[in-house]
């Protein structure tokens, strides 16, 4: 198990929010950060602090991406025409592991990364094992036949914990999903408020 995977709930505690809306999140029972000093009185946060927090929260939500992975995604978003904030979200939601998570083939975004890494998914009939693989509108993502009876898949498919995203069309019988289009920020079913505009300010400062 990777350090990023094992530390997933530390991200919740550090942010003081239940990032994925999971019943097991420690934030449901306490709202302070990890460590013995978690309950200290909060001081006023600077603009830079707010921007950094917004970046850390978005990085954490997508499986605690490395700074290199996240900054590269931001740079691509900035190069594209249009609103950089919206471009950033569209790129993050176009990741193969994000779509596997949105399709509810697995219970968590961390599990989605491992699931893809271990070769359990195809894109347009070809096996792809790169979590950051960028999907395009119309791409069909499917769980490989030999992987469909895995416990975590059956658990996720049966769960009502999360809603489906409108931009991912799912066929539960064949365990396939079509990436309809890259979404706008307002369409993404985040359990908490995300502020990509502050992320843009962070990198622009």
UniProtKB/Swiss-Prot annotation:
Pfam families named among the record's database cross-references: Ribosomal_S4, S4
GO cellular component: small ribosomal subunit
Domain S4 RNA-binding: 94-154
InterPro entries, A to Z: Ribosomal_uS4 (IPR022801), Ribosomal_uS4_bac-type (IPR005709), Ribosomal_uS4_CS (IPR018079), Ribosomal_uS4_N (IPR001912), S4_RNA-bd (IPR002942), S4_RNA-bd_sf (IPR036986)
Region feature Disordered, mapped onto this chain: 1-46
Keywords: Ribonucleoprotein, Ribosomal protein, RNA-binding, rRNA-binding
Coiled-coil boundaries: none
Entry GO MF terms: rRNA binding; structural constituent of ribosome
Membrane among keywords: no
Record-linked Gene3D superfamilies: Ribosomal Protein S4 Delta 41, Chain A, domain 1, RNA-binding S4 domain
Disulfide bonds: none
Domain of life (superkingdom): Bacteria
Keyword flag Transferase: no
An example Gene Ontology biological process: translation
Subunit note: Part of the 30S ribosomal subunit. Contacts protein S5. The interaction surface between S4 and S5 is involved in control of translational fidelity.
Family matches, as PANTHER family: 30S 40S RIBOSOMAL PROTEIN, SMALL RIBOSOMAL SUBUNIT PROTEIN US4M
Protein task: One of the primary rRNA binding proteins, it binds directly to 16S rRNA where it nucleates assembly of the body of the 30S subunit.
Family, similarity comment: Belongs to the universal ribosomal protein uS4 family.
Name by which UniProt lists this protein: Small ribosomal subunit protein uS4
Gene name linked to the record: rpsD
């Amino acid at each position: 198990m990777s350090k990023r995977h094992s530390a997933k709930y530390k991200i919740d505690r550090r942010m003081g929010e239940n990032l994925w809306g999971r019943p097991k999140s420690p934030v449901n029972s306490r709202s302070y950060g990890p460590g013995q000093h978690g309950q200290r009185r909060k001081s006023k946060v600077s603009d830079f602090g707010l921007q950094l927090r917004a970046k850390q929260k978005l990085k954490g939500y997508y499986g605690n991406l490395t700074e290199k992975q996240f900054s590269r995604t931001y740079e691509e978003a900035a190069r594209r025409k249009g609103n950089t904030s919206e471009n950033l979200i569209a790129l993050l939601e176009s990741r193969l592991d994000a779509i596997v998570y949105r399709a509810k083939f697995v219970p968590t975004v961390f599990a989605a990364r491992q699931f893809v890494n271990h070769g359990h998914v195809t894109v347009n009939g070809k096996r792809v094992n790169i979590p950051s693989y960028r999907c395009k509108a119309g791409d069909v993502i499917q769980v490989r036949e030999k992987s469909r009876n895995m416990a975590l898949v059956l658990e996720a498919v049966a769960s009502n914990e999360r809603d489906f995203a409108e931009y991912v069309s799912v066929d539960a019988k064949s365990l396939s999903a079509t990436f309809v289009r890259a979404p706008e920020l307002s369409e993404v079913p985040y359990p908490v408020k995300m502020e990509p505009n502050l992320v843009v300010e962070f990198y622009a400062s």
